[in-house]
Curated annotation (Swiss-Prot):
Subunit structure: Composed of two chains; the small (or glutamine) chain promotes the hydrolysis of glutamine to ammonia, which is used by the large (or ammonia) chain to synthesize carbamoyl phosphate. Tetramer of heterodimers (alpha,beta)4.
S-S pairs: none
The organism's taxonomic lineage, starting at the top: Archaea, Methanobacteriati, Thermoplasmatota, Thermoplasmata, Thermoplasmatales
CDD domains linked to this entry: MGS_CPS_II
Gene: carB
Sites where the protein binds Mn(2+) 2: E296, N298
One GO BP annotation of this record: glutamine metabolic process
MF GO annotations: ATP binding; carbamoyl-phosphate synthase (ammonia) activity; carbamoyl-phosphate synthase (glutamine-hydrolyzing) activity; metal ion binding
UniProt family annotation: Belongs to the CarB family.
Stated name of the protein: Carbamoyl phosphate synthase large chain
Keyword Cytoplasm: no
Sequence positions that bind Mg(2+) 1: Q284, E296
Positions of the UniProt region annotated as Carboxyphosphate synthetic domain: 1-398
Sites where the protein binds Mn(2+) 1: Q284, E296
Length: 1047
C-alpha cells in the first residue's frame, strides 16, 4: 500500500524537558520519527521546548518550534503552518496527554486535524484505568482486583477494600507519579488525603498488590492491516512492586518456559489488536507459576521502546512512523539488514542487561525504590552471557560499584538490603554470595529468581582468593566471564591500567560481534558492535577514523546536553569527510542510534573499553569534549595506557591543570585575573581555619567533579566542619572560596584554536551568584551585558586561550560585582549551555569546535542577539517526598526548557504557562526591604497579594495591603496550605534563612507548590523579573529561525 496522501504537513510533538520517567529516549524516538516521515516526503514541523535535544536541530525537521508544549501553542502552530496531521506518540506522556486535550477541546475537529498512528480513542482506552479495566474484563484477560477511592467518600471507600496491601495508581501519569504500595489502612487513608489535597483528581485507582510476582514486558508493534509482532520480551530481575524503570532488566527473558513465553506473547498480541494500536506499544505482565495478570499498556513509544530498539537493533520509532504514514510491516525494509522486512521478529544470540542510574549520590533521600520512579538514567551492557552483560552494565554506571562490587556492612544490615527494594540490592546479593549466604533465602527475600543469583555466583567465584599484588594467572577465563579490569584491580591490588597494559602485551583482547536483528542469518549493512572474549572478530576496517566517546548514563549535571554535542560532532565529521566511531553505554540516546556514526560500539565509557576499541579499530583520533566530566577524567589515563597522544583538542596536560582547582587558582592569580578570595585546605581542620580567615559565607569546591558535587554556600561554622568531612571523603584537597554576595553570574561559551577565539554568547543568570549554572534561570539577549563588561570578558577569554592553549569548545563561569569580573571556573569541554546558545544564535558551534580540533583556524564572530532566550531548569522534587526545594552551588535539576521572546517579558510570560492573579509572599528578613517594590509592581498589575504574618506586617508598614495567611501551628485561619490546596494562589514567592528551623517552616509550603504545579519563586531577583513580566504582555509562537531575524 502506498503512503497516505490525505495528509501533507505533520506536527510532531516532543516530550519537553528531561524529567524523571521521561528522558533522552524521547529525543531518540522523536528524531527517528521526524527523519522517517521526511523520507516519505512529508513536511514535518516539530514542537519541543527542550533545546538540548537533537530533534530541535534543523537537520531533523523542516520547521522547529522551541515553544511551550501547550494547547494554545499547538493551535497557533496549526494556524501558521497549515497542519493537517499530528503525531503525538513520540513525545512520551506529555505529548499523549496533549493529544487528548486537543481532542476534548474540539481543536482537532475545528481544524480537521488527523491523529496519525494509534487513534486518540485507543489512547484513552489504554490510559484511562477504568476504561482499560472494563476492556480487559470484556476480553476475559486476567487482571488484579480493582477498587476506587472517591474524593468525597475517602473513609467509606478505604474501609470497604477487602485486601491489603494494595497499590495506588493514577491515570494518564508518568513514571508511576502518585503511585505507591500501601501496607495498611491507616497509611492508605493518609495517602489518599494527601493526594487529593495535592491534586484536582476526583478518584484514586487502587489495585490488588501483586508484590513478589515476576514482571515481564513485551514490546509490540502493529500496523493498520492487523499485522502484529513482538520485537522482544524483557524480564525484570526485581519482582512486581518495583517500577520497570527502576528495575534491572534482561533481554531476552532468561527464566520463562516456552509455554509461558508463548502464553504471554499470545495475550500481548490479542490485547494490542483489541485496542486498535497502530504503531509501537509496551505491555506489562505479572507472572507466577504459569498464572499471569495484565498490568498495563503504554500506547506509545516509551523508555522500554528505546531499550528494546538498542537491545535488538530493530528501530521501533522509525518503523512506527512508517506505519503512521500508512505502510504495513510487510512493506517496510529493515534498515539494519536492508534485505529483510519489518514483519520479521528479531532474533538475538546475545544478552543485554539494563541497570538504572539513581541520583542518590546527589540527594540525601530515602533510597527505597518502588512503583514510582526515582532514577534519572540507565545503562545497558551487551554480552554473550548474562554474566558478561551484567558486569558491563555495572562498569557503565560510573559510580563506586563500577570499580568494586563489595558492600561493607554488617550481616543484619546486608539481609535488610537484600529484602528491601533499594538501589544497592544487587550488590547486597553479591556481598551475600561472598559471605556464603543461602541462595534460596536470598531469592525468597529479594524476589530475584535463583537462576540469576547462581549466575552471579559464577562472577563471585571467579573473584575469590586472588593473590594481592599479582595479576591472576587465569585472567583470560576471568575476562570471558565479563569482569572489567577495574573490578579485577579491587580484588588483586594491581592498578587497573596496569592490568590493561598487561592484557595488551599478552594479546588478551576482546573481539567484536555485530547486532543484526537476525542472529547472523543475513548480511548486515550496519556495524553495530559489542565486545566479547571469543575468537572470531567482525570489526570492519575503521583505520583513520575518529572516535567520539559519549557521556554514559544520564545523571544530574551530565545529561542530554552532552549527547547533543556528541551527535553534532559526528555529523560535522561526516560533512568534513571523516569516518566516525561512537562509543557509549546509554540506550536512551540519539548517539547510540545505529546509523548516526559509521560504527557504533555499545560499550562502557571507561579507559579499558575505550582503549580496546582504539586498538582494534585503528582510529586516528579521540574526541572527549562531548562526554562531560567522564571524558575529562579519563583522557590522561587513556593516553598513558596507549603510550601516545591521541586526544584531539585541548591537551590532556592542560585539562589536568584546569581541573585541579588548586593549580588553576594559582595560574589565574599569576595571570592577574580577579577571582574570589581563596585558600587551599589540606584537611578538615585546615578547612575550618582558612574559612574563618576568609570570613563566612564561603563555598567549598573539590576538583574533577561535575554539577558542583558537594558544593554549598556555608554560613554556619558548625555546619562547615560537617561538610568538610564529607568533601574530604571524595577529594584530596579543597578550594575554600569566599562567596561573592550580590554578584551576577554569567556563563561564557567559546570556541578557540589555541590562539584565536570566538565567543558563542554570554548568558546571564537572573538569580544572584551562588546558584549552580545548571539550575539557574538564565537569559541571552540584546543589551543584557554592558559593553565594558563584555570587553573585560573578552580579555579574560583571550588570556585563558593562550595560557592553556584551548582548542575546541570551552566554558568560562564568571561573577560580576561593582564593575569587576571574577573568574569562578573554566571547563575545557563542551558545557550544558552549548545546545541552548547554539539554538539562540543559529550557529553550529560544535561544528566549528570540531573544525578547530582537526586543525582549522577560528574567526572571531561577534554575536548580536536579536531576541531574548530564557533558559529555565526543571527539578525532580515531586519524586522525592522527603527532599526540600532549596538550591545552591550543587546542581539538582534534571533538565531544561527554552522560552524565546521578542522581549524578555514575553519569554518570562511563556515560562509561567498560566495566568497569575494571586501571589503569596513569604520572605526572610534580609529580603523584606527588596520585596516592597516587587509587591508594589504586582499590586499595580491587579494581582491579589497574600503574605505570612511577618511579611504582611512589613509590607503594611510600607503602605502595601495584603491578606495574612497562617501556618498550621498558628491555629488561625485562613491557613496557607488550605489556600494553596484550594487553588486560590497562583504563584508563591518564598525565600528562607538557611537555618534548620526556617527551612523546616517553609518545607510544607514548598512541597505542596511542587505537587500542585504552582510556580515557586525562591529568589528575589527572579521574583522581580516575573513581576515585571505579568500583565498585558503580547505572546506569540514562532519558528526558532524567526527569532534570529527579529530586531
Amino acid at each position: 500500500m502506498p503512503r497516505r496522501d490525505d495528509i501533507h504537513r505533520i506536527l510532531v510533538i516532543g516530550s519537553g524537558p528531561v524529567v524523571i520517567g521521561q528522558a533522552a529516549e524521547f529525543d531518540y524516538s522523536g528524531s527517528q520519527a521526524c527523519l522517517s516521515l521526511r523520507e516519505e516526503g512529508y513536511y514535518v514541523v516539530l514542537l519541543n521546548s527542550n533545546p538540548a535535544t537533537i530533534q530541535t536541530d534543523h537537520r531533523i525537521a523542516d520547521r522547529v518550534y522551541i515553544e511551550p508544549i501547550t494547547v494554545e501553542a499547538v493551535e497557533r502552530i496549526i494556524e501558521k503552518e497549515k497542519i493537517d496531521a499530528i503525531e503525538p506518540h513520540m513525545g512520551g506522556q506529555t505529548a499523549l496527554n496533549l493529544a487528548v486535550k486537543l481532542k476534548n477541546s474540539g481543536i482537532l475537529q475545528r481544524y480537521g486535524i488527523k491523529i496519525i498512528g494509534t487513534p486518540v480513542e485507543s489512547i484513552e482506552l489504554a490510559e484511562d484505568r477504568e476504561k482499560f479495566y472494563e476492556f480487559l474484563k470484556a476480553m476475559g484477560e486476567p487482571q488484579p482486583a480493582r477498587y476506587r477511592i472517591r474524593r468525597d467518600h475517602i473513609d467509606e471507600d478505604v474501609a470497604s477494600i477487602p485486601d491489603i496491601p494494595v497499590i495506588v495508581r493514577t491515570s494518564f501519569s508518568l513514571g508511576g507519579t502518585g503511585g505507591s504500595i500501601v501496607q495498611n489502612r491507616q497509611d492508605l487513608l493518609a495517602m489518599a488525603e494527601n493526594l487529593f489535597r495535592a491534586s484536582d483528581i476526583d478518584y484514586l485507582e487502587v489495585n490488588e498488590s501483586l508484590e513478589g510476582m515476576k514482571e515481564i514486558e513485551y514490546e509490540v508493534i502493529r500496523d493498520s492491516f492487523g499485522n502484529c509482532i513482538t520485537v522482544c520480551n524483557m524480564e525484570n530481575l526485581d519482582p512486581m512492586g518495583v517500577h520497570t524503570g527502576e528495575s534491572i532488566v534482561v533481554t531476552p527473558s532468561q527464566t520463562l518456559s516456552d509455554i509461558e513465553y508463548q502464553m504471554l506473547r499470545d495475550s500481548a498480541i490479542r490485547i494490542i489488536s483489541g485496542l486498535g494500536i497502530e504503531g509501537a506499544c509496551n505491555i506489562q505482565f505479572a507472572l507466577s507459576e504459569g498464572r499471569y495478570y495484565v498490568i498495563e499498556v503504554n500506547p506509545r513509544t516509551s523508555r522500554s521502546s528505546a531499550l528494546a530498539s538498542k537491545a535488538t537493533g530493530y528501530p521501533i520509532a522509525r518503523i512506527a512512523a512508517k506505519i503512521a504514514a500508512g505502510y504495513g510491516l510487510h512493506e517496510i525494509k529493515n534498515p539494519i539488514t536492508k534485505s529483510t522486512f519489518a514483519a520479521y521478529e528479531p532474533s538475538l544470540d546475545y544478552v543485554t542487561v539494563k541497570i538504572p542510574r539513581w541520583p542518590f549520590d546527589k540527594f540525601s533521600v530515602d533510597r527505597t525504590i518502588g512503583v514510582q520512579m526515582k532514577s534519572i538514567g540507565e545503562v545497558m551492557g551487551i554480552g554473550r552471557t548474562f554474566e558478561e552483560a551484567l558486569m558491563k552494565a555495572i562498569a557503565s554506571l560510573d559510580n563506586a560499584f563500577s570499580s568494586n562490587i563489595r558492600l561493607h556492612v554488617p550481616d543484619d544490615e546486608l539481609w535488610r538490603l537484600i529484602g528491601k527494594p533499594n538501589d544497592r540490592r544487587i550488590f547486597a546479593i553479591f556481598e551475600g554470595l561472598f559471605r556464603n549466604f543461602d541462595v534460596k533465602r536470598m531469592s525468597r527475600l529479594s524476589g530475584y529468581d535463583e537462576y540469576f543469583i547462581e549466575k552471579m555466583r559464577n562472577i563471585v567465584e571467579a573473584l575469590r582468593n586472588m593473590d594481592m599484588g599479582r595479576i591472576p594467572e587465569n585472567l583470560l577465563r576471568i575476562k570471558r566471564i565479563g569482569i572489567p579490569d577495574e573490578i579485577i584491580s579491587a580484588f588483586c591490588g594491581v592498578p587497573a591500567d596496569t592490568i590493561t597494559k598487561y592484557r595488551i602485551d599478552r594479546n588478551i583482547m576482546p573481539v567484536y560481534k555485530r547486532i543484526d536483528t537476525c542472529s547472523g542469518e543475513f548480511e548486515v549493512a550496519v556495524p553495530y558492535m559489542y565486545s566479547t572474549y571469543e575468537d572470531e572478530d567482525e570489526t570492519p576496517d575503521l583505520s583513520g577514523s575518529i572516535m567520539i566517546i559519549g557521556s554514559g548514563p544520564n545523571r544530574i549535571a551530565q545529561g542530554l546536553e552532552f549527547d547533543y554535542g556528541s551527535v553534532k560532532a559526528i555529523l560535522a565529521l561526516r560533512d568534513m569527510g571523516y569516518r566516525s566511531i561512537m562509543l557509549n553505554s546509554n540506550p536512551e540516546t540519539v548517539s547510540t542510534d545505529f546509523d548516526i556514526s559509521d560504527a557504533l560500539f555499545f560499550e562502557p565509557v571507561t579507559p579499558e573499553y575505550v582503549v580496546n576499541v582504539i586498538r582494534r579499530s585503528g582510529c586516528a583520533g579521540l574526541i572527549v569534549q562531548f562526554s562531560g566530566q567522564t571524558g575529562q577524567n579519563m583522557a590522561r589515563r587513556i593516553e598513558e595506557i596507549l603510550g601516545k597522544h591521541i586526544v584531539l583538542g585541548t591537551s590532556t596536560e592542560s585539562i589536568d591543570r584546569i581541573e585541579d582547582r588548586t593549580v588553576f587558582s594559582r595560574v589565574i592569580e599569576g595571570l592577574g585575573i580577579k577571582q574570589p578570595p581563596f585558600a587551599i585546605a589540606e584537611n578538615e581542620n585546615d578547612t575550618v581555619r582558612k574559612a574563618m580567615g576568609l570570613g563566612l559565607p564561603i563555598i567549598l569546591r573539590s576538583s574533577h567533579v561535575i554539577g558542583g558535587r558537594s558544593m554549598e554556600i556555608i554560613y554556619d561554622v558548625d555546619y562547615l566542619a560537617d561538610r568538610a568531612r564529607e568533601i574530604f571523603a571524595i577529594s584530596k584537597n579543597v578550594l575554600v572560596s569566599k562567596y561573592l554576595e550580590n554578584a551576577v553570574e554569567m556563563d561564557v561559551d567559546f570556541v578557540s584554536d589555541g590562539t584565536s577565539y570566538s565567543i558563542c554568547g554570554i548568558i546571564v543568570h537572573i538569580e544572584e551568584a551562588g546558584v549552580h549554572s545548571g539550575d539557574a534561570t538564565m537569559v541571552y539577549g540584546p543589551g543584557i551585558v554592558p559593553v565594558d563588561i563584555e570587553k573585560k570578558i573578552e580579555g579574560i577569554v583571550g588570556s585563558m586561550v593562550r595560557e592553556f592553549r584551548l582548542i575546541g569548545l570551552s566554558n568560562l563561569q564568571i561573577a560580576v560585582r561593582d564593575g569587576d569580573v571574577y573568574v569562578i571556573e573554566l571547563n575545557a569541554r563542551s558545557s550544558r549551555s552549548v545546545p541552548f546558545i547554539s539554538k539562540a544564535t543559529g550557529i553550529d558551534w560544535v561544528r566549528l569546535a570540531v573544525e578547530c580540533m582537526i586543525g582549522s583556524r577560528i574567526e572571531n564572530k561577534r554575536m548580536e542577539a536579536k531576541s531574548y532566550f530564557l533558559k529555565v531548569s526543571v527539578f525532580p522534587f515531586s519524586k522525592f517526598s522527603d527532599m526540600d526545594v532549596v538550591y545552591g552551588p550543587e546542581m539538582k535539576s534534571t533538565g531544561e526548557a527554552m522560552y524565546p521572546g521578542r522581549t524578555l517579558a514575553e519569554a518570562l510570560r511563556k515560562s509561567l504557562q498560566r495566568s497569575i492573579s494571586s501571589v503569596l509572599i513569604t520572605v526572610r528578613d534580609e529580603d523584606k526591604p527588596r520585596i516592597v517594590d516587587i509587591a508594589r509592581i504586582l499590586l499595580e498589575k491587579g494581582v491579589k497579594l497574600y503574605a505570612t504574618a511577618g511579611t504582611s506586617k512589613f509590607l503594611a508598614d510600607h503602605g502595601i495591603p495584603t491578606e495574612t495567611l497562617y501556618r498550621v501551628r498558628d491555629r488561625r485561619e485562613p491557613r496557607i496550605l488550605d489556600m494553596i490546596s484550594s487553588g486560590s494562589i497562583d504563584m508563591v514567592i518564598n525565600t528562607t534563612e538557611m537555618t534548620a528551623g526556617a527551612v523546616r517552616d517553609g518545607f510544607k509550603i514548598r512541597r505542596i507548590c511542587i505537587m500542585r504545579g504552582i510556580p515557586l519563586i525562591m529568589n528575589i531577583n527572579l521574583a522581580r523579573a516575573y513581576a515585571e513580566a505579568l500583565g498585558q504582555v503580547e505572546v506569540d509562537y514562532r519558528e526558532i529561525g524567526d527569532y534570529l531575524q527579529v530586531s
